[in-house]
Design a protein with these regions (language model features):
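ABC family nucleotide-binding domain
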Residues: 1-151
Length: 151
């Protein structure tokens, strides 16, 4: 469950102060599908960066599964990202020198998952996105849509 209460984000420079989010209150239940939509510059990316713990709000509260995220320290935020969050960025951020298999496997290596278990998980994910047959290819050998699925 994701919940925000009066979430605000203010960007300040010497010349101008910009309110990217203005007291956003949001409640998303587990399994619920939500689309964040709006014109360019309305705060969509800012909201998603806060929900993904890449940025901290200027004010307001953010709860994830009942825990207050905006009060967590860096180690707690790292654990939250590692165990609960996933990102698909507009740019794919795949490592060109690694195969499709290795790109998918890399986060599991950092999580300390054993080789046999990693192999099973990677193969299952690649099969799910219909790319198991591309496991030994490199990102530049894939279409944009295929790269997006790998990411």
């Amino acid at each position: 469950m994701i919940k925000t209460e009066k979430l605000s984000m203010l960007f300040t420079t010497e010349e101008v102060q910009t309110k990217a989010l203005n007291e956003v209150t949001l409640h998303v239940e587990q399994g619920e599908f939500v689309a964040i939509m709006g014109p360019s510059g309305c705060g969509k990316s800012t909201l998603l960066n806060i929900l993904g713990t890449l940025d901290s709000p200027t004010s307001g509260s953010y709860f994830f599964e009942g825990k207050q995220v905006d009060k967590m320290n860096e180690n707690q935020l790292t654990a939250l990202r590692k165990n609960n969050l996933g990102f698909i960025f507009q740019s794919f951020n795949l490592i060109d020198e690694l195969t499709v298999y290795e790109n998918v496997e890399l986060p599991l290596v950092y999580m300390g998952i054993k080789t046999a278990q990693r192999k099973e998980k990677v193969n299952k994910v690649l099969e799910k996105v219909n790319l198991l047959h591309r496991a030994n290819h490199y990102p530049q050998q894939l279409s944009g849509g295929q790269q997006q699925r790998v990411a």
